[in-house]
């Protein structure tokens, strides 16, 4: 694993570094029906992260999917304190962008290296201002 920062494009940037454990998935995730906003747990039985809690972790995956209501699920998670510490995706789509903006959840996309392939669940990363991920 590299120790050099990976450059991404910040969609919702961090003001201060955020250090947290990573939760990695090779699948896109729908927040509506796929995540319980009360607990922060992935509840979609067809998703490889089913049973995992997103709370306080940096979620690394290809992107989001699903209903526009997913934006409000992310906002509710932020309000309840069950949101991820940050999200890093290959490509951010509008549902994810709106949810992260509303919930003030750090969102980085278009990493210069494929972090879905490079990182493993349990690794610790640091999100740095300007869209850098220290791995």
From Swiss-Prot:
Q: Name one GO molecular function term.
A: hydro-lyase activity
Q: Do you know which Gene3D superfamilies this protein is assigned to?
A: Phosphohistidine domain
Any Pfam family hit: AcnX_swivel_put
User: InterPro entries annotated for this entry?
Assistant: PMDh-S-like, PMDh-S-like_dom, PMDh_S
Please give the pathway this protein is involved in. Answer: Isoprenoid biosynthesis; isopentenyl diphosphate biosynthesis via mevalonate pathway
EC identifiers of the protein? 4.2.1.182
Cystine bridges: which residues?
A: none
Which keywords label this protein? Isoprene biosynthesis, Lyase
Superkingdom per UniProt? Archaea
Q: Please provide the Gene Ontology terms (biological process) for this protein.
A: isopentenyl diphosphate biosynthetic process, mevalonate pathway
The protein's annotated catalytic reaction(s) are:
(R)-5-phosphomevalonate = (2E)-3-methyl-5-phosphooxypent-2-enoate + H2O
Active site (UniProt): 67
Q: What does this protein do?
A: Component of a hydro-lyase that catalyzes the dehydration of mevalonate 5-phosphate (MVA5P) to form trans-anhydromevalonate 5-phosphate (tAHMP). Involved in the archaeal mevalonate (MVA) pathway, which provides fundamental precursors for isoprenoid biosynthesis, such as isopentenyl diphosphate (IPP) and dimethylallyl diphosphate (DMAPP).
What do we know about how this protein assembles, alone or with others?
A: Heterodimer composed of a large subunit (PMDh-L) and a small subunit (PMDh-S).
Q: What's the family? A: Belongs to the AcnX type II small subunit family.
The molecule here is called Phosphomevalonate dehydratase small subunit
- Tell me the organism: Methanopyrus kandleri (strain AV19 / DSM 6324 / JCM 9639 / NBRC 100938)
């Amino acid at each position: 694993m590299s120790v050099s920062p990976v450059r991404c494009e910040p969609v919702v940037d961090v003001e201060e570094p955020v250090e947290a454990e990573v939760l990695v998935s090779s699948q896109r995730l729908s927040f509506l029906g796929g995540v319980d906003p009360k607990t922060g747990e992935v509840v979609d039985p067809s998703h490889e992260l089913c049973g995992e809690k997103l709370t306080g972790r940096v979620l690394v995956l290809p992107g989001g999917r699903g209903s526009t209501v997913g934006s409000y699920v992310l906002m509710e998670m932020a309000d309840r304190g069950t949101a991820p510490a940050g999200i890093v995706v290959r490509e951010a789509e509008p549902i994810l962008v709106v949810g992260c903006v509303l919930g003030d959840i750090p969102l980085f996309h278009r990493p210069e290296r494929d972090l879905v392939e490079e990182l493993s669940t349990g690794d610790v990363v640091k999100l740095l201002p300007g869209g850098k991920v220290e791995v």
